[in-house]
Amino acid sequence: MGNKWSKSWPQVRERMRRAPAPAADGVGAVSQDLAKHGAITSSNTAATNADCAWLEAQTEEEVGFPVKPQIPLRPMTYKGAVDLSFFLKEKGGLDGLIYSKKRQEILDLWVHNTQGYFPDWQNYTPGPGIRYPLTFGWCYKLVPVDPSEVEEANEGENNCLLHPICQHGIEDEEREVLQWKFDSSLARRHIARELHPEFYKDC
């Protein structure tokens, strides 16, 4: 019996390896289309989807990165989110960085152009307080920074008014200054789904 199984196992293993990974829980509608259909469907256009409109604007304005996407468009997967999280942790730069919408857009555009992931995966739970990633596997949460720390960081400086830390949460609905914090437990536990199961009804 074992002999019969061992003969067919290499073909099965190869088929499993070639099967596309499913989209991670919590990704947007376009990534769900990419996972199900292998392409963006007509239900997600620049007119109906904010992420498509944003990406189209980046392409038309040629703002950001000079390279075009280097690999085919694909949805963010659990493994992709975990790998990207640990890559950014190892290389440094994101952990502890003050969050702003512009910085998120720069990261999304870089990931889109270098890895091919459609930029609808970096979404967070609503505030106030810690914002957990909706995409399972993304190990960066947004943590509020104490206003006194903001003042200490800016002490003696008068030329950084546009720096995100100086905006005192002006972009945030809760008026909180947020920073990205790496949390490896987010690779094992989907806290956003536990706190907000209503966000995952259509997944």
Curated annotation (Swiss-Prot):
Task: Identify its membrane topology class.
Answer: Lipid-anchor
| UniProt family annotation | Belongs to the lentivirus primate group Nef protein family.
The positions annotated as site (Might play a role in AP-1 recruitment to the Nef-MHC-I complex) read 16
Source species of the chain: Human immunodeficiency virus type 1 group M subtype J (isolate SE9280)
Induced by what? Expressed early in the viral replication cycle.
* Positions of the UniProt region annotated as Binding to ATP6V1H: 145-177
On subunit structure and binding partners, the annotation says:
Monomer; cytosolic form. Homodimer; membrane bound form. Interacts with Nef associated p21-activated kinase (PAK2); this interaction activates PAK2. Associates with the Nef-MHC-I-AP1 complex; this complex is required for MHC-I internalization. Interacts (via C-terminus) with host PI3-kinase. Interacts with host PACS1; this interaction seems to be weak. Interacts with host PACS2. Interacts with host LCK and MAPK3; these interactions inhibit the kinase activity of the latter. Interacts with host ATP6V1H; this interaction may play a role in CD4 endocytosis.
* Renumbered ranges of motif Dileucine internalization motif: 161-162
Gene3D superfamilies (UniProt xref): HIV 1 nef anchor domain, Nef Regulatory Factor
Residues at the site labelled Cleavage: 54-55
At which residues is Phosphoserine found? 6
Enumerate the Pfam families for this protein. F-protein (PF00469)
Q: Name one GO molecular function term.
A: SH3 domain binding
Q: What is any one GO biological process for this UniProt entry?
A: symbiont-mediated suppression of host autophagy
What is this protein's record name?
Answer: Protein Nef
Identify the gene encoding this protein.
nef
Q: What else is known?
A: HIV-1 lineages are divided in three main groups, M (for Major), O (for Outlier), and N (for New, or Non-M, Non-O). The vast majority of strains found worldwide belong to the group M. Group O seems to be endemic to and largely confined to Cameroon and neighboring countries in West Central Africa, where these viruses represent a small minority of HIV-1 strains. The group N is represented by a limited number of isolates from Cameroonian persons. The group M is further subdivided in 9 clades or subtypes (A to D, F to H, J and K).
Function recorded in the entry:
Factor of infectivity and pathogenicity, required for optimal virus replication. Alters numerous pathways of T-lymphocyte function and down-regulates immunity surface molecules in order to evade host defense and increase viral infectivity. Alters the functionality of other immunity cells, like dendritic cells, monocytes/macrophages and NK cells.
User: Post-translation: what modifications?
Assistant: The virion-associated Nef proteins are cleaved by the viral protease to release the soluble C-terminal core protein. Nef is probably cleaved concomitantly with viral structural proteins on maturation of virus particles. Myristoylated.
Q: Which InterPro entries match?
A: HIV-1_Nef_anchor_sf, HIV-1_Nef_core_sf, HIV_Nef
